[in-house]
Design a protein with these regions (language model features):
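Bilayer-spanning, highly hydrophobic alpha-helical transmembrane segments
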Residues: 7-18, 140-167
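Short, non-transmembrane cytosolic segments of multipass membrane proteins
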Residues: 85-120
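Charged, amphipathic alpha-helical oligomerization/scaffolding segments
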Residues: 35, 42, 106, 125-128, ...
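Juxtamembrane/interface alpha-helical elements of multi-pass membrane proteins
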Residues: 2-75
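Membrane-interface, cytosolic juxtamembrane amphipathic helix immediately N-terminal to a transmembrane helix
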Residues: 101, 112-157
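Helix-adjacent hinge/juxtasegments
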Residues: 58-99
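Residue-level recognition of alpha-helical structural elements
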Residues: 29-32, 54, 78, 103, ...
Length: 167
């Protein structure tokens, strides 16, 4: 009987950890959006002030996403490179696997216009994208805080229910 109680406790703890793991995708989404947002200003400086070619400006980025797009660019537009990276990286375990549709849509709109117009239009594009990514990042932060507790609690509750059934 004591062994069953110990096993029931372990089962409850494992279910709580499973709930916490499910919430990890929300933290990854928040991290990817925050990183992309932080990388916009340095990219703008490299493109508009240092006047680096788009591919070089992207490849020099500290952000993994922008760097991947830059590496995929030879012979392609920024949008084509983004689409190629998105297809590869949205698969399970990829850099973008935790992004929501609206996150990908905002990034696609950014890459669709990146490097396609004059400096003034590019400044407006960077400002618009920074605002949109900031909003999405704030939503991801709020969602992460709320749902991490929820998923952990649901996992613990499920584990407790299974433990009761096991004992």
């Amino acid at each position: 009987m004591p062994v069953r109680i110990v096993l029931a406790g372990i089962l409850a703890a494992l279910c709580a950890l499973a709930g916490r793991t499910a919430a990890a995708a929300l933290a990854r989404r928040k991290r990817v959006l925050s990183s992309a947002l932080a990388a916009l200003e340095p990219l703008k400086i490299r493109m508009l002030h240092r006047r680096l070619p788009l591919e070089a400006a992207l490849c020099e980025s500290e952000d993994a996403l922008l760097r991947l797009v830059g590496e995929a660019m030879p012979g392609k537009t920024a949008l084509e490179a983004w689409d190629a990276v998105r297809i590869r990286q949205t698969k399970r375990g990829g850099l973008l696997d935790s992004l929501a549709r609206e996150d990908c849509a905002a990034l696609r709109a950014f890459f669709a216009q990146l490097g396609e117009s004059g400096a003034r239009e590019q400044e407006a594009l960077f400002a618009r994208t920074a605002e949109e990514l900031g909003t999405l990042s704030a939503q991801a932060d709020k969602s992460c805080g709320e749902r991490t507790r929820l998923y952990t609690s649901l996992g613990a509750l499920l584990g407790a229910a299974l433990a009761i059934l096991a004992v």
